[in-house]
From Swiss-Prot:
GO biological process: aerobic respiration; electron transport coupled proton transport
The protein's assembly and partners: NDH-1 is composed of 14 different subunits. Subunits NuoB, C, D, E, F, and G constitute the peripheral sector of the complex.
Primary localization: membrane
Cofactor: binding details: Binds 1 [4Fe-4S] cluster.
Catalytic activity: a quinone + NADH + 5 H(+)(in) = a quinol + NAD(+) + 4 H(+)(out)
Name the record gives this protein: NADH-quinone oxidoreductase subunit B
One GO molecular-function entry: NADH dehydrogenase (ubiquinone) activity
Length: 160
């Protein structure tokens, strides 16, 4: 039976990659790693006005239950090992959103002796959300960009 015949019969055809990535994008569970004022905007995005639940985003308190980490705020040298430890406790696949100028590159405190100049020096970052602090809309846009990135990835390894 040709593909046209399958579609006429009411069947939907897809690849396993697209199906798995579709389910992953519809249920992103971020673990909040709020370090400074950007965390207030992150909480604002989760409240009723913006309602991240409509994107399938449900904040989780444990790294073992989450697949996205949102680093929001200034990362200090003393907090960097804790960030890496929490990241290592997350199950694969896992993604990181760096939220705000301080998390992206040190921000206002860039030249301070105690500030890590970007959380990408500690964990790999998938999406950067700029701003000081970024608005809730900017965080939502970053989550949408992460969903688009997940849809483009190959989930099942192909042997070539």
């Amino acid at each position: 039976m040709a593909i046209e015949g399958v579609l006429n019969e009411g069947f939907v055809t897809t690849t396993a990659d697209k199906l798995i990535n579709w389910t992953r994008t519809g249920s992103l569970w971020p673990m909040t790693f709020g370090l400074a004022c950007c965390a207030v905007e992150m909480m604002h995005a989760g409240a009723s006005r913006y309602d991240l639940d409509r994107f399938g985003v449900v904040f989780r308190p444990s790294p073992r239950q989450s697949d996205v980490m949102i680093v929001a705020g200034t990362l200090c040298n003393k907090m960097a090992p804790a960030l890496r430890k929490v990241y290592d406790q997350m199950a694969e696949p896992r993604w990181v959103i760096s939220m705000g100028s301080c998390a992206n590159g040190g921000g206002y405190y860039h030249y301070s002796y105690s500030v890590v100049r970007g959380c990408d020096r500690i964990v790999p970052v998938d999406v950067y959300v700029p701003g000081c602090p970024p608005t809730a809309e900017a965080l939502i846009y970053g989550i949408i960009q992460l969903q688009a990135k997940i849809r483009r990835t190959n989930t099942i390894a192909r042997k070539g």
